[in-house]
Design a protein with these regions (language model features):
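Metallocofactor- and cofactor-centric catalytic cores in central/energy metabolism, strongly enriched
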Residues: 1-199
Length: 199
């Protein structure tokens, strides 16, 4: 144990609900928002960055010295961790940089500090009776599946506005990076179930 805290980014957010991943005490949370915000969120980040998927923005010089890739992901001039999975360079860089000196508060794009995740099929099936009862009782009128990429540029906020306008007796199921446009909104609960369920 070297005291390194590990955070996911982007579409790795739902992984925090996976028992085989969340059993590791070094995994502390999710840093930042969607993949398209990497350049802003990784700028001057005092930690090592390991890309595991191809949602990769061009790497800026301000953090190029701390970027590593693995699996099918690669980027010119970045160190690639091969099949041997020797993460020594990543660990050494993390120790060298030391992380933030003080606790940081990060918000979603709407200012929210918390998101709930983990509503994969197993979890949803585990509360299916509760959902069915809520529908039969008239407490839930609609389910909306919002899957897609809203993007980060001004004016690309269709899903944000859509979700804000959904009836208070509806459930929003999320997929893909478009969720970052609204997953930090506090839309409340219905019968103890959050109105936003990140799948």
């Amino acid at each position: 144990d070297k005291g390194i805290h590990i955070y996911t980014h982007g579409e790795m957010l739902p992984a925090h609900a996976y028992p085989k991943l969340k059993k590791y005490p070094h995994l502390k949370g999710n840093f930042g928002t969607a993949w398209q915000n990497q350049q802003k969120e990784f700028d001057n980040l005092p930690g090592a960055i390991l890309y595991t998927t191809n949602c990769l923005m061009p790497v800026k010089p301000s953090y190029a010295d701390r970027v590593f890739t693995t699996e099918v992901v690669s980027y010119p001039e970045m160190i690639h961790i091969g099949e041997d999975k020797d993460f020594t360079p990543v660990i050494e860089k993390a120790l060298e940089l030391g992380g933030y000196k003080e606790n940081q508060v990060r918000t979603g794009i709407n200012g929210g500090e918390y998101v709930v995740t983990g509503f994969g099929h197993g979890t949803v099936l585990g509360v299916a009776d509760k959902l069915i009862d809520a529908v039969k009782a008239g407490d839930i009128s609609h389910f909306f599946l919002v899957g897609g990429c809203d993007g980060a540029r001004t004016g690309r906020n269709y899903y944000t506005e859509f979700v804000k306008q959904t009836p208070k007796d509806s459930i929003i199921l999320t997929l893909a990076c478009g969720k970052y446009r609204f997953n930090d909104l506090d839309l409340g609960e219905i019968d103890g179930l959050p109105r936003i369920m990140d799948m």
